[in-house]
Amino acid sequence: GSDLKFRKSSVLEALGRNNEAVSFCCKWFEKELENIMAATAYVYALIGAKEYEAAEKLIHQFIIDESECLEENEIMFRAASKYYGAIGDKTKKKQLDKVLKEYEAYVDRLIEEEWLGSDEDGWEDEELPFD
């Protein structure tokens, strides 16, 4: 599915076949207009082909609030960061990187709570069931 198509577009870019990557991603995105993976792959391909205006339009289509990175739009935030780096907008790139870093810290906290449990698990340190 989408993962395989995303990888194919990345391989095309890595091989320097930017126009082919753009064409592939364009067709994929046109078939799946709501698919953020298709859109993100397309943004990366457009950046590789230096088609910055089209890349920016796609980014704004999927990122409405640049201060809110969520699980659903994280990959587009990463593409947007790369886009702003490519066009030399250091301020905007730094802003998005900060939001991404905050999101990563949030995810790390969630994982930590899930794996280690929170302090509110009902056990006092001195009354653990395995002591």
Language model features with spans:
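Canonical positions in the second alpha-helix
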Residues: 27-28, 62, 66, 100
